[in-house]
Amino acid sequence: MIAPAPITLEGSGVRLEPLTLAHHDGVAAAAADGRLWELWFTSVANPEDTRGYIAEAVEGQRAGHMLPWAVRELATGSIVGSTRYHDISPQVDRLEIGYTWYAATWQRSHVNTACKLLLLTHAFETLGCRVVGFRTDNFNFASQRAIEALGARKDGVIRHHQARRDGTVRDSVMYSILAGEWPEVQRHLATRLARHADETH
């Protein structure tokens, strides 16, 4: 596996731009669409904490265990969310996709499918990952449904796993896609995007 480096990924109406402080206002505005920070089981920062949120992500990138992006929707030119590679482990050819959130206006749109197709294609076909993982809070049922809709398989639940922002400790629901499963998942995601395109024209 090649160690991930900052890169712009674009396709299906979205562009993933390496996250920097230049995205501050766009990220803050996207989080404000739906007041996403009020969902206690998410990783979305209060707009007042956006600078620290971005700085933490960039520091993770420098340390080599994280690669964050801002998500830009191309038809509007707006920043509509953020996502990351994290827990990057070249020793076992594995990384995870997470810290993903979208402005309320863009939830249940083509954006998540388009982003996941870009991220998974890059992970499997460019970086050479053997497995891509996902994790989510046991109470974040929308996230669990979204991950399962991608075609990821549920590996299990790690109990008492991670601290939430409010100080409580969550159970983490773990999912993964293996390299051998990627061609089928890729076809599935491409079909979903084609169906969305047909419905919007």
Region annotations inferred by a language model:
Residues 135, 153-167:
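Conserved catalytic-core motifs of GNAT/GCN5-like acyltransferases
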Residues 48-49, 141-142, 164-166:
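Short secondary-structure boundary/hinge segments and terminal tails
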Residues 125-135:
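Conserved GNAT acetyl-CoA-binding A-motif
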